[in-house]
């Protein structure tokens, strides 16, 4: 792969709504969008998605599909650890002890929290290895974001805008150093 060809491309897994769309909207790069809406389902097409990442220096793992977000990240790490790529992974404060809403007893939410915990732990575990490698992986960990996914939920909490999360992704991508983790929370006005 020619490293010069990939400098102007960003792949966003989950690019049509919410945070992924906000990242695509502010991108000055060619966007390689990979979502269910255009035939790339993270639940069943990990190999196909991986093949689309070769030509992209920037990758955003945004789409949530159970444990497949983690499986995709593991494959990205194994394949690209010796390449100069930057990967932003959208995790969630729901995957942290402080962020999980204990009062929200929905089984789907509990499963979501566990998958995000596993994802955050994996990113933490590989950070020491990444110091000696050209690959950068950023844990972008927002609190509640005002998107279709959170409609009608946590309305009593201040919500981040998807654009605010997108700005943090670009902050990480533009820096010459690795920002291991960025936690974003909206304060009440």
Language model regions located:
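N-terminal Rossmann NAD(P)H-binding glycine-rich loop of SDR-like oxidoreductase domains
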Residues: 8-28
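Structural signature of the Rossmann-like NAD(P)-dependent dehydrogenase/reductase core
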Residues: 12-13, 60-62, 86-92, 136-141
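Adenosine-cofactor binding site in Rossmann-like domains, unifying the SAM/SAH pocket
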Residues: 30-51, 64-67, 71
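A glycine-rich helix->loop->beta "capping" turn
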Residues: 35, 49-61, 85, 178
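Catalytic loop of short-chain dehydrogenase/reductase
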Residues: 68, 81-131, 143-144
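Short-chain dehydrogenase/reductase
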Residues: 73-77, 122-124, 166
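C-terminal helical subdomain
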Residues: 139-140, 154-189
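Short, flexible catalytic-loop segment of classical short-chain dehydrogenase/reductase
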Residues: 142-152
